[in-house]
Structure formats: structure tokens, C-alpha cells
Amino acid sequence: MENNLIVIENGQLNIYLLDNQVVWEVGRMSKEHTPDIPMHATTISRRHGRFQNMDGIWFYMDENPKNGTIRNQKKLSSGLHGRVKPVMVSPGDVFVFGGGKDAVVSPATVWAFFRTRYYDAPWRAMDSRGYSKFLIVDGDTRTKLANPEPGSVVECEHGMVIYMGALTYVIGPLKVMGSKGSTDGTNSYRTN
């Protein structure tokens, strides 16, 4: 099992292999502070939170940052009397750091995805501006994605696709085609 965190900020995708250390601090970089998972958005606190392995199980601890953290579309809250409250992390968990009360993926926030499967292959970025529908081909399997929200993830047998609006990230031998759709209900897909 390769626990890893995929982090996307301002079009940049980074992967952190969490099993390489026990604690990973999340925060905004400054002259005096370099967290393990550095972020640049001003909505991120210097000491925003941390991922920590406790007895083989991964947890996220939010340090009660000003602009908060969203996990799976729910704002994380502090524990009793403002204490840090560990939240067990599961494969497929989506985090939005610095988004306030809303889980909005935007240039002011940082998106992250926790997974236990690691691909030792390069990611490809595809220009997806203007596309409202996608066809993802993984061997004989076809998956349709219509009107996705930024931060949508499709995991396939041989790879995965992350839709972020203007850019879509692809890993593995998948073929991804985009369509702008039409008013008559037909679709013309273009391969990127």
C-alpha cells in the first residue's frame, strides 16, 4: 500500500508519498517557515494542519486555521475548547484548504486527494476549457462524465482522471476525449 496525497494548487500537481514520514505539516511558506506540504495561497495559514500516521492509520489534524479546511464537502471543526481534533483519513477523501465555509475549488484554495494506490508514471495535463462532457476510455471500459464540478475524480482500473475546470489531469494509459455538447443532443468528442 502506498498512501499518497495528490495536491493541486494553481495548476501545479504534486504528489506526497505519506509513508515516507510519520507527520506531514501543511501550511503556507514563509521566510521563517517551510512546511512539509508547502502551499502558496494567502488563504492558507502558515500552520494550517498536519497529516499524521498513528499506529498505521492516517489522520488529519486541522490547526483551526482562519480560512478552514473542507473534507468531503464538510467543514472540519475544532474539538472541545478549540483543541485539535484528529479525523481519520480514508482513500478517496477530498480536501479543500483555505476555502472558508464553502468547498469551492478556485485559485484562492488548494485541492488535495488521499489515496492508497500509487502510479509510477507521469501525469498529463489536458486543456479542458469549454468542455462539458468527457469520455474516458480504459481498455474496453468507457466512462462518461457530464458537467463535472472542479475537483471531480474518476478512478479507473489502469489510471485516474482529475477534472479541475480549465485543466484535467490524467495518469495511466487512459484515453480522454472532451465534448462541448450541442443543442440537438449529439456530441462530437475531441481527443486531447
Language-model segment annotations:
Residues 2-9, 14, 26, 57-59, ...:
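C-terminal boundary/linker segments immediately following FHA domains
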Residues 23:
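Glycine- and aspartate-rich repeat motifs characteristic of hemolysin/RTX-like Ca2+-binding segments
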Residues 41-46:
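Short coil-to-beta-strand transition motifs
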